[in-house]
């Protein structure tokens, strides 16, 4: 049964896969930081190469954000692809078992029926997930068009990565707000001053009335 795409706010499916060097990578390894997980159909094809190179060129700008590619290709295929285009981020091999389907691609809903020249077949639909530090999907791009995609993902990743710092910057404001009541005594002092001035006027008026009565007598 084909799994559906993962919606925003939903926990991303856990995975454990080897990268181009044979190192095992798991979703849990990226906990605590944003993760760009992009699925692509095949190594060293035109659109897939353009997409990989675009992420590679922008990689230094993904500060605090991990970028990982996944396709059904083998570790050996990934190694050649990464070496040819000098890709320094992980490419995970979701190689399907004989007669089976790629497990992680299926879990993320990107293993779908496709059509080319009137023929239908199963394959990876180009999809990108932005996963938050808590492991939930923050954003998803479906049926990705390569041109400008890496830049769009970078902008969204920066916004997500800045979320924690924005929260921490808001805390001092809340603390300073707690000191706001200190202004109240000043207002009270002014009110007291008004009362005193009013009472002094009343006293003066009463003295004037007394003097007038005395003069009449």
Task: Describe every region a protein language model picked out.
Residues 1-217:
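Chalcogenol-based redox active-site neighborhoods
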């Amino acid at each position: 049964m084909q799994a559906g795409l993962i919606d925003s706010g939903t926990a991303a499916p856990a995975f454990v896969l080897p990268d181009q060097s044979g190192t095992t990578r798991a979703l849990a390894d990226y906990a605590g930081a944003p993760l760009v997980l992009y699925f692509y159909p095949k190594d060293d094809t035109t659109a897939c190469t353009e997409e990989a190179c675009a992420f590679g060129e922008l990689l230094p700008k993904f500060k605090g954000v991990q970028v990982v590619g996944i396709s059904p290709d083998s570790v050996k295929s990934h190694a050649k692809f990464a070496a040819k285009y000098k890709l320094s981020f992980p490419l995970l091999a979701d190689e399907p078992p004989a007669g089976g389907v790629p497990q992680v691609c299926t879990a993320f809903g990107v293993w779908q029926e496709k059509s080319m020249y009137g023929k239908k077949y199963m394959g990876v639909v180009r999809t990108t997930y932005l996963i938050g530090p808590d492991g939930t999907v923050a954003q998803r791009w479906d049926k990705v068009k390569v041109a400008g995609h890496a830049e769009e993902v970078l902008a969204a990743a920066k916004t997500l990565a800045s979320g924690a710092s924005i929260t921490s910057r808001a805390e001092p404001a809340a603390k300073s707000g707690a000191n706001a009541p200190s202004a109240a005594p000043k207002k009270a002092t002014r009110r007291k001053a008004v009362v005193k001035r009013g009472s002094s006027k009343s006293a003066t008026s009463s003295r004037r009335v007394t003097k007038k009565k005395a003069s009449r007598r």
